[in-house]
Amino acid sequence: MVTVRREKDSMGAIEVPADKLWGAQTQRSLEHFRISTEKMPVSLIHALALTKRAAAKVNQDLGLLAAEKASAIIQAADEVLAGKHADEFPLAIWQTGSGTQSNMNMNEVLANRASEILGGVRGMERKVHPNDDVNKSQSSNDVFPTAMHVAALLALREHLIPQLSALTDTLRDKSHAFADIVKIGRTHLQDATPLTLGQEISGWVAMLEHNLRHIEHSLPHVAELALGGTAVGTGLNTHPEYARRVAEELATITAAPFVTAPNKFEALATCDALVQAHGALKGLAASLMKIANDVRWLASGPRCGIGEIAIPENEPGSSIMPGKVNPTQCEAVTMLCCQVMGNDVAINMGGASGNFELNVYRPMVIHNFLQTVRLLADGMESFNKHCASGIEPNRERITQLLNESLMLVTALNTHIGYDKAAEIAKKAHKEGLTLKASAVALGYLSDEEFDAWVRPELMVGSMTPGR
């Protein structure tokens, strides 16, 4: 039999498991929102703890909170940040759209734990109050968006950007290493004029470099914090210096460039910063999907596909076809990119649907945002380690396909004109001839002229990979 204790909120008393630190409002949420399995992300829980820690420190500094209470709240928050009490945050994403219940979940846990630190008990006789002390100078309406931005910015800076930079570096190295390998290009899935493998990969590098700039450009808006706006953005019940000082405290303890939002009404009423930042992440997903698809097409085979590059063979690919090996890293990346694009639709809908002074789609928005960051960061790390770093050219196959291409005839345009060059290509294709044989048979040029004018290595231009 589960031992319980009585907890009380503005709606009255309710029984709570005696071994849990949470209180009445958390218990009500557990009972009223038994929806699916998605819980508040751990990084969001930690961001809430950071927010409460900073608020307690600033409230103490401003003379609004007793030093012993502030110290106990800070210690309790540090325990949460250290990974303790992880099972004290059981609430579903699918709850109130303001995140109020998760804010109160944190308030109740920290209040009960702080009370114990001060020698008191958890429950209605506790020494620290979840609203009056832990939530002092705050509202769920400014706390939750603040925690969203803290979690989002830290995830981008600490996880996604390093992995994006690492993958970019790997592909840049490959681009330089393969700069002298001339291969056939392809447009519309048809043969086109030559380029080097290094040039082809340099396009991927530039895509990722642009994506990094777009993501970094979104960070200053994400760094703006709503804390201090309280209920509707007016700052009701806060000290005049509170908003600025609490943002500075969060910047200090996270070593991140957080600032107080210049307009708290925007900060509470919208999720625009995360909508825009996620748009940059969706752009990254689009680029990664293109790169992964190019890699698996170029590596297709081993005997009946394009086969211009080889990628690492990591695991068996079929339960029925012996010896088959598949481009599994590419497949994982393309799947997660699809999920990111779906997340973007949900975030756009949530961001567009806030009414008046408060957006109430916040738990869904941050859940999808953090999932996107995790998927992209983990996906790039895996793709880099198990695929991109092991890409190698199949020089024999590249040369074979290059020599068989009819599009080398493009080099003759400036010598004999487009129409005659097209006639050479069509005759070669129809009769199964080489371009040279077709050109000589038509009498448009000699063997020597063909060899002098149709030189794939001179058709790739002067574009240096990486520029």
Swiss-Prot record:
Enzyme's top EC category: lyase
UniProt KW Oxidoreductase keyword: no
InterPro entries to which the protein is assigned, alphabetical: Fum_hydII, Fumarase/histidase_N, Fumarase_C_C, Fumarate_lyase_CS, Fumarate_lyase_fam, Fumarate_lyase_N, L-Aspartase-like
EC code(s) of this entry: 4.2.1.2
Miscellaneous remark of the record: There are 2 substrate-binding sites: the catalytic A site, and the non-catalytic B site that may play a role in the transfer of substrate or product between the active site and the solvent. Alternatively, the B site may bind allosteric effectors.
UniProt cross-references to Pfam families, sorted A to Z: FumaraseC_C, Lyase_1
Protein's recorded name: Fumarate hydratase class II
Protein family (similarity comment): Belongs to the class-II fumarase/aspartase family. Fumarase subfamily.
PROSITE patterns documented for this protein: FUMARATE_LYASES
Sequence positions that bind substrate: 98-100, 126, 129-132, 139-141, 187, 319, 324-326
Catalytic activity: (S)-malate = fumarate + H2O
Family matches, as PANTHER family: ASPARTATEAMMONIA/ARGININOSUCCINATE/ADENYLOSUCCINATE LYASE, FUMARATE HYDRATASE, MITOCHONDRIAL
Cysteine pairings via disulfide bonds: none
Organism of this sequence: Salmonella typhimurium (strain LT2 / SGSC1412 / ATCC 700720)
Record-linked HAMAP family: FumaraseC
